[in-house]
Structures are given as C-alpha cells and as structure tokens.
Amino acid sequence: MLVTTTERISGQEYEIIGEVFGLTTRSKNMFKDLGAGLKSVVGGEIKGYTDMQREARDQAIERLKAEASKLGADAVVMMRFDSGTIGTDMQSVVAYGTAVKYI
C-alpha cells in the first residue's frame, strides 16, 4: 500500500475514505537506560533510544496501513507523525493520514 506525505498522488484520481491512525507505545529498557545516562554526561547518540524510536515509527506505519486496508483503501495521503512521552520511561508514536480509494 502506498503511503505518502503529499496531498496528491500524481496521475491518480481517488475518493477520500477518512482518517486512519497507527499507534504504538514503547517502554525503555532499564539496562540501556544506564548506558544512556553515561552518554548524557559525555555526549553522543544514544543508539538504543534511536533504535527504539525507529522501530516504533515503523510499527506505527504498519498499523496505519492495516487500518487503511480494513477500510478498503488503496493508499494513505498526507501521512504525518506525532510522538510524545508517557511518564519518564515510555514513548508513544502515532502515524496518521487520510485513507483513499482509487477511482
């Protein structure tokens, strides 16, 4: 399924089905947290958190596609991300967009 951040799909006519969302929430690994604490002192990328964020983003997109597919969509346009923290040790990522059906 095509997922795009653009409003239009070049050369394609479609009708709008509606909004779709894909959400995931991840918790930090307490052992990786120890390494992250040290990195925050000396500086540098915290690879464990970067990987967690990438995996969360990918899962949110897959869930977005699954929801769109259930609605009979052929694509999702205007896809966006939002993220936030829940408490001190959880990260939530949502992918959202507009499900469309080709005509």
UniProtKB/Swiss-Prot annotation:
Superkingdom of origin: Bacteria
Cited SUPFAM superfamilies: YbjQ-like (SSF117782)
InterPro entries to which the protein is assigned, alphabetical: UPF0145_dom_sf (IPR035439), UPF0145_YbjQ-like (IPR002765)
UniProt xrefs under Pfam families: YbjQ_1 (PF01906)
Family in the record: Belongs to the UPF0145 family.
HAMAP family xrefs: UPF0145
Protein name in UniProt: UPF0145 protein EF_0241
Originating organism: Enterococcus faecalis (strain ATCC 700802 / V583)
